[in-house]
């Protein structure tokens, strides 16, 4: 019985430690990864942690790898986990890639990306 309690406590401690050291991950994006959409006016990215916009960036490339003009990265007024990126030029039909680098309020930095298609 004593060994079971000690083992359970060790497992619980490891689980909590793993969560404390976790980096932000993208929960959902709009447009969604792999989706086909009409030209979006903005990207909306929701993360698992609060984001520091001044230390974060998003790059969007379109057909042929051309950079897509975007406005400044902003946080949603009600949720610091949601990042908004205006797309300032009309997106032409084709494949798009989004690459992001986010810094969270706890100081961790993480990178990721996804693709979508404009019809």
Language-model features, listed with the residues they occupy:
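Short, surface-exposed alpha-helix to beta-strand junction/turn motifs within ectodomains of secreted
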Residues: 44-45, 49-71
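Bacterial N-terminal signal peptides that target proteins for export
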Residues: 1-7
């Amino acid at each position: 019985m004593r060994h079971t309690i000690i083992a359970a406590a060790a497992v619980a401690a490891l689980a909590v430690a793993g969560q404390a050291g976790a980096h932000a991950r993208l929960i959902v994006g709009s447009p969604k990864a792999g989706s086909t959409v009409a030209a979006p006016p903005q990207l909306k990215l929701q993360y698992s942690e609060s984001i520091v916009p001044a230390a974060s960036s998003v790059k969007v490339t379109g057909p042929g790898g051309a950079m897509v003009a975007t406005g400044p990265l902003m946080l949603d007024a009600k949720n610091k986990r949601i990042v908004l990126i205006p797309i300032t030029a009309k997106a032409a039909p084709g494949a798009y890639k989004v690459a992001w680098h986010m810094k969270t309020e706890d100081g961790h930095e993480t990178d990721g990306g996804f693709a979508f298609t404009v019809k």
